[in-house]
């Protein structure tokens, strides 16, 4: 896959840029020797994607051994399907529309409900930026609740629940019955710390999904205005997911570049995307992203609300924020980060911190509380927020506005006071049947990471935990994808459901596309390490397949099975670029005479030969005895 061309910060001709990007995307998404395939659900319109990596045969002295294809979880959407026609100006296919219609509990509104949304729709200055396929928004009918949590508590298995059950299972229940996968599916026992991890793929059923959602332990972020979505699940008892961030600022990025970053993030495996835009044309940029996003999109609505006040936190009002929530919900945002736990009485607790309040949303609300000496309006209006959320099935991501910004401040009084308030708000949201996940730190030394998970499980009643790392040391600017990846792997093992990626540019500047790639790959491996540690069924399949390819010097399969095939091959080719090196039984690290795996194979061949010789000697001995044990006849 080729690295994307640099996109101009702004050319003034987004339509031309988007057309060029549409033509180029298919080329970029070619995965080596693999294809996107679909598993059929109980109805024709439940087609669940996965990617199958095809392997080369193994050649031995005894003949040829076929290696089976390896299924992997796939987030690429239609961008990873060579057969799909991609036109960003048209958006993605609406795969959920029939499901929404059949439930009969939503209505198509005659027009937008948000004042700001209406204003933007009629602003001639932004006409050239608007997505040209705008549809009228849906909302729950009066007195109806349309959340996945509500359905789950009613005992209803929705198509979304069936979809994610098939997606999590990856057809491993079928493969476990096939002899060619027997050795590849062996894995170490996990340590799940009390989680209800399935022990076999056939336990990952739509009913299992429904129960986990009904209990509040998992969420399916799926706004009714995001019909393009391929449903996914976030929960302690499922695969660990990762989030990638994007967003423009006042000084960088164009609309096209943000769409490109979204697609680029999907290419490397982001399960969800958060649009953290704070610059111009936030509304229009978000529309383009959602209409072309097969994964859930999250936002921090207070950022846009602040932009509407000209950046003056004191001028924020509940009415302004409420209109922003409705605006974004009607566009199709799947989850909102809302910093409702930053209470007025908690702000003084941060005074003696080394780095104070580092959350942008947390600092905005703290400043508002102090300026007005009133309680956080997100807290006092929380029930009204829930009414909006359940009308569109937007999930809460309850923000950790008082998260520690350095390891010195980790696990302090203010952090856990806010966490306990988030637990209170979780209970309140659940009374409305609104889905909830909880955001977590941050910066935490390794020995104190588990305490964060324990506190969250106890005080937030096992709602899914969603953490930013945590970074386990503060001495490595430029390498914070690693400092945070260490913490992420650990807290994922302890029970965190989703990890928010960190790039090498953390604390230093806005990430470019290569930084995004590095951040996502780092977090994919952290999430995978957590899945292995907690014993997710089938998690070790890809590891075993790659290890077998490595031992058999199937270099191309090693590249194909890796998280970043392009980089793995480029590193190999830096020293051994010749085509013949792809079949050589050594690499540049040890050379042909000192390769441990080559020597091991020779030892095995020798042992097999010795075994055959011993067996031949034993057979001759038996024959000698049977003939009377006479030396001479």
UniProtKB/Swiss-Prot annotation:
EC category name: lyase
Reaction equation(s) it catalyzes: 5-amino-1-(5-phospho-beta-D-ribosyl)imidazole + S-adenosyl-L-methionine = 4-amino-2-methyl-5-(phosphooxymethyl)pyrimidine + CO + 5'-deoxyadenosine + formate + L-methionine + 3 H(+)
Entry binding sites for Zn(2+): 443, 507
Keywords: 4Fe-4S, Iron, Iron-sulfur, Lyase, Metal-binding, S-adenosyl-L-methionine, Thiamine biosynthesis, Zinc
Positions contributing to [4Fe-4S] cluster binding: 587, 590, 595
Pfam families from the UniProt entry: ThiC-associated, ThiC_Rad_SAM
GO molecular function, one term: 4 iron, 4 sulfur cluster binding
GO cellular component terms, semicolon-separated: cytosol
TM helices/strands, residue ranges: none
Assigned EC number: 4.1.99.17
Named cofactor requirement(s): [4Fe-4S] cluster
InterPro entries: ThiC, ThiC-associated_dom, ThiC/Bza_core_dom, ThiC/BzaA/B
Biological process (GO), any one: thiamine biosynthetic process
Pathway membership: Cofactor biosynthesis; thiamine diphosphate biosynthesis
Family the UniProt entry places it in: Belongs to the ThiC family.
Subunit organization: Homodimer.
Function: Catalyzes the synthesis of the hydroxymethylpyrimidine phosphate (HMP-P) moiety of thiamine from aminoimidazole ribotide (AIR) in a radical S-adenosyl-L-methionine (SAM)-dependent reaction.
Protein name: Phosphomethylpyrimidine synthase
Organism the protein comes from: Neisseria meningitidis serogroup C (strain 053442)
